[in-house]
């Protein structure tokens, strides 16, 4: 038997047992800051054989860091750059977290107090002295930003040569090289026979009607590509205002927005009770309407929109809309995102939605960046940071020999920053709709990928095929009856010459292998030969993203190499279709894999992000897919849980509310199963699919010492002992003794059945014989 290669991060699906978990807060049923909890009675030990792992964690980290430095530091000394220059003094949020959180309920309250304003003034004086020094030495050309709320720093224009010199000054604490975050992109389509929970409206937006919470008394800041505030989804006004026009008037002068737009007035930034603040940090004006992007409007609609077409997750939440991507160039800059984050903190938001990022994110940005620390300060102040894991598939995607990794190098992690930062809750995507399947030869369940149109929208294979049939057959299908078709395996790669000895395929489905000619050409040749549909199977491992171009093609789909090889082993066979043949939904293939380079668990939670219908600029609606859509779905759930916690436990601090929200989410998530009925790896789904109902109705939740998330990160086994100790606690929220059953499911990466050289990105369950 060949040795199995075990990936360094294993699945620990813990359905917890606690023989006697007694409530420690019986009097008021409120969790304490440092609760006395009942730990699981015995530490669980799992022995792992790792003899086949060739690279140490240090070797892998060294290689990745070297590649990252080469990529990001490829500057000439004369190149103009933007850098954040930090000073030694505390920022407002640091002072709040360190000393003033006992006096002020939120960092916003402190920052807008007399004490906070005085501190901000002192910070500005120190920054002015530094600017004078830098200009006197000829090291900078322009000051972009003055930061005081979440970081004590200035953003300046300089050259890369001067950047290195600035970092050596005694008056400078550190320098941060500006990074560029990807302009959010949406993706169309997803498919993967097991039924997972579908708790969404027909739009794919999370259905929150099972609870009474609607988001009243909460505020969400959305950092994105632009917004159409006039859309009907934003016209229903909330029942309760946290931020009023008076609040905006009182603090506007202290906000970064005012520092860049001289004479900025309330009428410029206050849109409505629903949208109390808007500003474009990338282009330095109050016009947040996007130049050429529907992304931000779509995201905001998912979180809190409401009209006769869509219902958002938290319809009564207020939305602070912050445009951080420029109109005429790609990429959001670190300095603009920091400026928006500062103003979001000043406004006192509950949560910040960031459907943006760069793939293969690190725990800290290049050059010893302090950005991670900034996010940690925001988290410490009690604001929930909800971020997209990114749409980067796996690290093997797009490779010359397949879309998955070799078994000798199974590291598939592409999860992106800022979701890799400790403070950020990293969100993976599951489809918002179930997946159709076909039964091949009476026994094989066949999942497929839709082809895309020239506009990158998914085609609809089943409906296109059924609509091409006689009316009698159409009625049978729509009434739930089965339709069976014959398929014919075409030799070679589906070129004209390959049909020479096939015979008549009129009314049949052509099974064609990928390779040599285009997908469009394969489908057109099959059509000309009389086929009613075409199935293209991959010649390498992984899925096919298939565009059919502008031609009038027959219905065409793609399937995996493994499935296609089984079908092609027969010259002919049958394919049975039925309108009720639907399963899932399943994890989105585009959703980035973890872990982080330091073997941290990211993503941490899953939400619906595949084929989500929401608002777009101009009053319209569209279906988009991406972790960018999963993130607002999760963000809406987060603010509803925060509303629940604040109402049930009013004495908790903002920090306690944020921590408990994450722990409830991760403790009660539903484990997502793949088409084989096995759990997806936590490197793909995190804790599982978020459940609002479970979160607000659970009698207990899990905590882990030393971390504010309900997760166990085993990291590396440096001494190669093969033994991991895992300890966690159960917090009992009820007045009764709770008993749970404990089970542990260990799993590893399965190997492709077609060549045994590539991982299949599917789970293989471990047992005593493995």
Where does each model-flagged region fall?
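Autoinhibitory propeptides
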Residues: 12, 22-28, 128-212, 216-219, ...
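Inhibitory N-terminal propeptides of secreted protease zymogens
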Residues: 39-184
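Subtilisin-like serine protease catalytic core
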Residues: 78, 97, 204-333, 347-350, ...
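Structured lumen-facing ectodomains of secretory-pathway proteins
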Residues: 232-241, 246-252, 256-266, 283, ...
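Hydrolase catalytic cores
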Residues: 300-303, 320-326, 350, 515, ...
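Short acidic, glycine-rich surface-loop motifs adjacent to enzyme active sites
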Residues: 319, 341-365, 388-389, 507-514
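C-terminal subdomain of the subtilisin-like protease fold in secreted/lumenal serine endopeptidases
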Residues: 353, 426, 555-568, 605, ...
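Surface-exposed binding patches on compact interaction domains or structured appendages
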Residues: 702-712, 735-770
């Amino acid at each position: 038997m060949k040795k199995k290669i075990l990936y360094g991060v294993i699945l620990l699906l813990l359905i917890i047992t606690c023989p006697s978990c007694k409530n420690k807060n019986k009097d008021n049923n409120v969790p304490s800051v440092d609760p006395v909890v009942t730990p699981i009675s015995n530490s669980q030990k799992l022995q792992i054989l790792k003899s086949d792992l060739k690279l140490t964690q240090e070797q892998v980290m060294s290689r990745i860091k070297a590649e990252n430095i080469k990529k990001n530091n490829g500057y000439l000394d004369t190149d103009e750059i933007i850098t954040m220059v930090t000073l030694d003094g505390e920022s407002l949020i640091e002072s709040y977290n360190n000393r003033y959180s006992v006096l002020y309920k939120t960092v916003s309250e402190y920052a807008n107090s007399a004490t906070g304003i005085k501190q901000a003034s002192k910070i500005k004086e120190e920054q002015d002295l530094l600017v004078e020094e830098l200009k006197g030495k000829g090291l900078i050309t322009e000051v972009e930003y003055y930061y005081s709320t979440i970081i004590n720093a200035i953003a300046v224009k300089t050259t890369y040569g001067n950047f290195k010199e600035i970092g050596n000054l005694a008056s400078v604490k550190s320098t941060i090289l500006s990074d560029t975050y990807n302009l959010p992109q949406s993706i169309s389509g997803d498919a993967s026979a097991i039924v997972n929970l579908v708790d969404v409206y027909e739009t794919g937006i999370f259905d929150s009607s099972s609870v009474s919470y609607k988001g009243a008394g909460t505020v969400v800041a959305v950092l994105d590509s632009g917004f159409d505030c006039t859309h009907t989804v934003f016209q229903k006004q909330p029942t309760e205002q946290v931020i009023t026009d008076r609040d905006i008037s009182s603090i506007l002068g202290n906000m970064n927005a005012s520092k860049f737009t001289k004479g900025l007035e309330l009428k410029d930034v206050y849109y409505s009770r629903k949208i109390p603040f808007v500003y474009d940090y990338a282009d330095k004006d109050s016009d947040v309407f996007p130049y050429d992007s529907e992304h931000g409007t779509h995201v905001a609609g998912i979180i809190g929109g409401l009209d006769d077409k869509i219902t958002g997750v938290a319809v009564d939440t207020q939305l602070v809309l912050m445009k951080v991507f420029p109109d005429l160039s790609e990429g959001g800059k670190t300095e603009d995102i920091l400026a928006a984050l500062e103003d979001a903190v000043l406004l006192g938001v509950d949560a910040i939605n960031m459907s943006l990022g760069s793939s293969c994110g690190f725990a800290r940005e290049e050059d010893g960046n302090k950005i991670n620390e900034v996010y940690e300060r925001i988290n410490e102040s009690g604001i929930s940071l909800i971020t997209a894991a990114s749409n980067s598939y796996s690290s093997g995607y797009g490779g010359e020999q397949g879309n998955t990794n070799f078994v000798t190098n199974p590291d598939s992690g592409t999860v992106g920053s800022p979701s890799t930062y400790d403070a950020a809750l990293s969100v993976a995507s599951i489809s918002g709709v179930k997946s159709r399947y076909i039964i091949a030869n009476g026994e094989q369940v066949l999942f497929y990928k839709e082809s895309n149109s020239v506009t990158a929208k998914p085609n609809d294979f089943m409906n296109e095929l059924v609509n091409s049939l006689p009316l009698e057959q159409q009625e049978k299908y729509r009434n739930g009856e089965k339709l069976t078709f014959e398929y014919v395996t075409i030799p070679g790669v589906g070129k004209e010459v390959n049909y020479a000895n096939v015979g008549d395929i009129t009314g049949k489905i052509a099974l064609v292998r990928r390779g040599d000619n285009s997908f469009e050409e394969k489908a057109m040749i099959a059509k000309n030969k009389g086929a009613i549909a075409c199935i293209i199977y991959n010649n390498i491992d992984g899925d096919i993203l298939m565009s059919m171009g502008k031609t009038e093609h027959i219905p065409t789909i793609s399937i995996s190499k493994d499935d296609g090889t089984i079908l092609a082993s027969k010259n002919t066979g049958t394919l049975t279709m039925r309108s009720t043949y639907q399963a899932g939904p399943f994890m989105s293939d585009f959703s980035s894999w973890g872990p982080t380079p330091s073997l941290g668990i990211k993503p941490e939670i899953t939400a619906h992000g595949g084929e989500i219908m929401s608002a777009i600029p101009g009053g319209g609606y569209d279906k988009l897919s991406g972790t960018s859509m999963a993130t607002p779905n999760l963000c809406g759930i987060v603010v509803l849980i925060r509303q629940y916690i604040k109402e049930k436990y009013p004495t908790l601090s903002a920090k306690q509310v944020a921590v408990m929200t994450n722990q409830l989410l991760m403790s009660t998530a539903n484990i997502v199963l793949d088409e084989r009925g096995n759990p997806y790896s936590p490197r793909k789904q995190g804790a599982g699919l978020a459940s609002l109902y479970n979160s607000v109705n659970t009698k207990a939740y899990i905590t882990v010492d030393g971390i504010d998330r309900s997760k166990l990160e085993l990291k590396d086994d440096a001494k190669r002992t093969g033994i991991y100790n895992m300890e966690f606690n159960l917090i009992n929220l009820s007045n009764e003794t709770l008993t749970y059953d404990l089970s542990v499911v260990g799993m590893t990466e399965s190997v492709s059945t077609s060549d045994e050289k590539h991982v299949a990105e599917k789970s293989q369950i471990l047992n005593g014989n493995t």
